[in-house]
């Protein structure tokens, strides 16, 4: 038990020059002694904090070193380009072969293309590491909080018939088939004079804008997709028609054309179909055959800066030509 482990640790700590390691200390020492690079050190932290299978697999993929090898390869190419440029600056009177200029230009273009290919990844690595963001949005009293509770299998949000009960963003973490999900219940969107509710509505719209997927929940008895709802449904969205058990007529043909699902949270109807649609969105978002993954915004910014510098280098050479 835990008490036995603590007792053993306490006794070991009494031995001279012996102490408990700090969190991450062995990884830190390995990095400082050149046994692993920063990318691998970060992937160890990602592996320890992995909550889903896909996060675990991604961390292991990076630990195996293909990303590191690729970045080292690009670095070596850039160093060769740099050494040639420096030689030209230091010895301007030397007649360097014209073929060298052509090769340097081509090499810089090749590196630039490779970096841009790595950057064109739909941010899959970062989404896997941080979680796939889903925002539940829509008008008041449509069943957004009930949907969050249903998907979470627990009471996360307060449910009430009073419109405007949810005023802040409520987040919870889910694991759907190994995919990490951060799902947010947001304030119902409507015209309101209440300052606090207006701030909540503003947060809702911001959450929807930054989400990887929007679940736009509407009441089957009063479907009005004009205005803001129409904007929300333009991309990365599923129209969730709740209270479909009360639906008297067929859906409007225009609504039927949208990516939609009819559900009833009260009767637990078609929730499985909604989850299936969410899974399809996840699979489409997470598909990546590439072994080179960017998992942090810092990595992305460094690559963007490098690509910009190479573009400037190429543009200046083109002007000289």
Language model regions located:
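Short, Asp-centered acidic motifs that coordinate Mg2+ and/or phosphate
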Residues: 181, 213, 238
